[in-house]
């Protein structure tokens, strides 16, 4: 689990194949750090906020993402974590960031799925039969601006604004990032 949290903040996990930590997986780039984070997570009674706070207050996380030619020559893939990574956000986080920076993000937690704005007709023809056609009940008011975590998903298709979303047919722990 801590590998996934690391991946969330650094773009790549301490074990590159975040969905597979078995014997056939990639080796950890920093095995001692991974073990220490896992032990800390356990010792803190699986407190996610504690681990996330630990990561974002670390000197490694707080480094600049500017890379000089000399550093790039020594460590081109940043395996040594000598600078902060640059990576694109997955679409749900991108939407949330846009809402937060505009002051529109509704911070309400929990509750039923919400139906934020979707272009008209985007769900047309996605049902197996006409009798099962789906009418998208677009939310009103503050529910339009809830976090993407609460956005309604059909089993067969992701919301239109979640571009490059993985299929719901299989479990995916590493979101694809749009270039």
Predicted regions and their residues:
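Primarily short, surface-exposed interaction patches in extracytoplasmic proteins
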Residues: 1-145, 156, 160-179
């Amino acid at each position: 689990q801590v590998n996934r949290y690391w991946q969330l903040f650094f773009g790549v996990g301490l074990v590159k194949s975040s969905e597979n930590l078995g014997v056939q997986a990639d080796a950890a780039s920093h095995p001692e750090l991974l073990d220490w984070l896992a032990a800390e997570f356990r010792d803190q009674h699986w407190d996610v906020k504690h681990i996330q706070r630990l990561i974002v207050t670390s000197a490694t996380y707080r480094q600049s993402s500017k890379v000089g030619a000399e550093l790039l020559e020594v460590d081109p893939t940043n395996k040594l974590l000598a600078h902060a990574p640059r990576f694109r956000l997955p679409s749900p986080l991108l939407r949330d960031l846009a809402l937060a920076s505009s002051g529109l993000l509704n911070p309400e937690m929990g509750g039923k799925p919400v139906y934020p704005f979707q272009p008209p007709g985007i769900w047309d023809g996605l049902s197996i039969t006409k009798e099962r056609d789906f009418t998208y009940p677009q939310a009103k008011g503050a529910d339009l601006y809830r976090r993407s975590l609460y956005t309604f998903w059909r089993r067969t298709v992701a919301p239109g604004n979640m571009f490059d979303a993985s299929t719901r047919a299989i479990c995916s722990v590493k979101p694809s990032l749009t270039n």
